[in-house]
Amino acid sequence: MSGSNGDKRVIGLYGEMRLAMELHKRGWQVYSAYIDEKFDFVILKSYCENCQTFKDAWTREGTYIDKKGNEKKGKTVTQLCETCHQDSLKMLVRFIQVKTSEGIPGKKTKSGEEVKKYSFHARIRYHLADSRIFYAWIQVWDEDNVNYYIFKTEDVALFDNLQIVSYQTTDNQKTTLRINKEGTVLNEGTKHDYSAFEDFRDNFDCLEDLIEGDCWK
């Protein structure tokens, strides 16, 4: 792609579509912002406080008599847990800012491995006092090779300095990483440690961790 604004929108929408499918596959309900302001996705997943695990709603099946006196079979989705049948389902909420990078071919490694340069733009506006806010940075190598780096906005501090002037005044601090097809970050920084990206990669499980903001009372 040429890098125009239109191309960036296309790759951005592609990344969001791929991420939405991955989240849906893992049981999340995915809602996209109607107006593009702060967060791209709001995702929900039902959690049973009684079972203390993620559960879907119970679909009750039974028979009933219709107006003509005929016996019919029917089913309805209830508000109850599918396992314990208690009214104990709560919705876990996560807010996600999605970033997608297509990458620019870079210099190969000494072993001849192909590498691309990807840029991640952290923005201070997303660094709120709310642990339910996450970044999903999507590395698109090609159609068959897509990696997802999932982390809290506060985790930017693990690989960048949030106090530098450019981050505080321009709202657009760029981190450029050399990444191979498998999604391994090859940067070896002296000021910053990029090993955190190994923990971030395909870290969809972190979205399910119960955190301080998950208060239903």
Features from the language model and the residues they span:
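Mixed-charge (Asp/Glu-Lys/Arg
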Residues: 1-37, 43-217
